[in-house]
């Protein structure tokens, strides 16, 4: 029976794909703390100018042109080898999906930028369609006809499915991640500072279940003492080697 590995990824796995991290030494929020307001739910819902700024900022994000790097592709190989039971990610860039990982293992803890919803009626939208009309409608609102209002448009605020500060994680995301992390034979943390909760709590959950933990991150984390293996090397170099070695060990 093959080894099962649960993985948590953070922004560090995507920096080599051209997406800057948020909390590292050169992170967006480290250098520009005011940019955290882009993802503040209360401001977004109550301040028209903030909504417009948030939409413009997200439209200009490098996420849209980014392609998966060798580290993302390594995790796709791990799944193809039948060894990956969980890929929980704090990233909303969808690069794991682009690399070939399946919805069966991916849990987008912090949502995804590719889809959007009306905060009033729940109508779903493709974010790319909204972005294409942003010059004409800088503060996107829902146009779904409401039968009980004489087919007048809903006019609710539209927001991307990225989880904002003050917003709950997708339903069941943490429960599934905690269960699979505690059932795995190994738990790997890849490119996360482990500063954001509840995602960071997966480490002590796995540790309490007796699961060996690998933390691969350029900087130290608060949970390094729980790790059985620490790797402070560039992820795009270290992760493919670790995956290849792990797969080879099963043959």
Predicted regions and their residues:
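Conserved catalytic core of sirtuin-type NAD+-dependent deacylases
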Residues: 1-251
């Amino acid at each position: 029976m093959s080894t099962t590995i649960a993985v948590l990824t953070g922004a560090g796995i995507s920096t080599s794909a051209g997406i800057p991290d948020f909390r590292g030494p050169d992170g967006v929020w480290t250098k520009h703390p005011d940019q955290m307001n882009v993802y503040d739910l209360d401001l977004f819902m109550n301040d028209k100018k903030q909504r417009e700024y948030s939409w413009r900022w997200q439209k200009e994000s490098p996420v849209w042109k980014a392609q998966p790097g060798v580290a993302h592709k390594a995790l796709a190989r791990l799944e193809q080898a039948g060894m990956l039971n969980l890929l929980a990610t704090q990233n909303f860039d969808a690069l794991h999906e682009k690399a070939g990982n399946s919805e069966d293992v991916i849990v987008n803890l912090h949502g995804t930028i590719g889809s959007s919803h009306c905060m009033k009626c729940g109508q779903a939208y493709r974010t790319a369609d909204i972005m294409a009309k942003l010059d004409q409608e800088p503060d996107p609102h829902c146009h779904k006809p409401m039968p009980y209002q004489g087919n007048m448009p809903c006019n609710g605020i539209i927001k991307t499915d990225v989880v904002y500060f003050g917003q709950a994680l997708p339903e069941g995301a943490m429960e599934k991640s905690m269960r699979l992390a505690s059932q795995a034979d190994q738990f790997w943390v890849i490119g996360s500072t482990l500063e954001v909760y509840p995602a960071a709590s997966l480490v002590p959950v796995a540790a309490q279940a007796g699961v060996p933990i690998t933390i691969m991150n350029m900087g130290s984390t608060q949970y390094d003492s729980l790790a059985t293996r620490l790797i402070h090397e560039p992820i795009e170099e270290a992760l493919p080697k670790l995956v290849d070695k792990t797969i080879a060990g099963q043959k």
